Amino acid sequence: MAGHSKWANTKHRKAAQDAKRGKIFTKIIRELVTAARLGGGDPGSNPRLRAAIDKALSNNMTRDTLNRAIARGVGGDEDANMETIIYEGYGPGGTAVMVECLSDNRNRTVSEVRHAFTKTGGNLGTDGSVSYLFTKKGVISYAPGLDEDAVMDAALEAGADDVVTYDDGAIDVFTPWETFGNVKDALDAAGLKAESAEVSMIPSTKADMDAETAPKLMRLIDMLEDCDDVQEVYHNGEISDEVAELL
């Protein structure tokens, strides 16, 4: 598929924000603890835990830190009253936005999320208002330089749904989220080292952002990611290379 890897661009932008790395680690640890508490400490039988482990490793978390978080979840933890909450809304330019949270206080969390939407010209929606536009999938991303045919053959044989190659040579492998770990293992075994790997919500449609709405969308994402309870922010905003250069 022709095009430029907007997915990769977003990931690179987030990865470059080193000042947020401590907060990112805190959120990943919270997800590891919760996933282990709810589904057990074996990633082979706990897809949510496997996804959290791959995300932790993609963000260069040490195995010691990762294993301690899993042990906390399996052994019972002070975060035992955490629950997953999904908020849906509309951002600048009519973008569809989903906000995944882990919280022990729904009132606090919804207040912070609503504030971010309101400050950037968006509004919080009701359950189901935008979720139908997204599909939960595994995404395994490769930097430019790999053999496209080798990645495609290994991925499809392992059960991937789709392989997308971009103009810059970057490759994204999309998988059913339930079998994400198995596909990742098969690609690793084939000697294909991923740049990042995680379970995400992939939009079925895109909303084009212009020079006016793109900065507002970026501000909304930043405000949401700054909330301690927010784990992930998904959206269908599409920012062209020309507009991105102006940000």
From Swiss-Prot:
A Gene Ontology biological process term: regulation of DNA-templated transcription
Gene Ontology molecular functions: DNA binding
Keywords per UniProt: Cytoplasm, DNA-binding, Transcription, Transcription regulation
A Pfam entry, by short name: Transcrip_reg
InterPro entries for this protein: Integrase-like_N, TACO1_YebC-like_2nd/3rd_dom, TACO1_YebC_N, Transcrip_reg_TACO1-like, Transcrip_reg_TACO1-like_dom3, YebC-like
Major location (coarse): cytoplasm
Cellular compartment(s): Cytoplasm
Cellular component terms (Gene Ontology): cytosol
UniProt keyword annotation of Cytoplasm present: yes
Family: Belongs to the TACO1 family.
NCBIfam families: PRK00110.1, PRK12378.1, YebC/PmpR family DNA-binding transcriptional regulator
HAMAP family registered for this protein in UniProt: Transcrip_reg_TACO1
The protein's name in its UniProt record: Probable transcriptional regulatory protein PC1_1817
Organism of provenance: Pectobacterium carotovorum subsp. carotovorum (strain PC1)
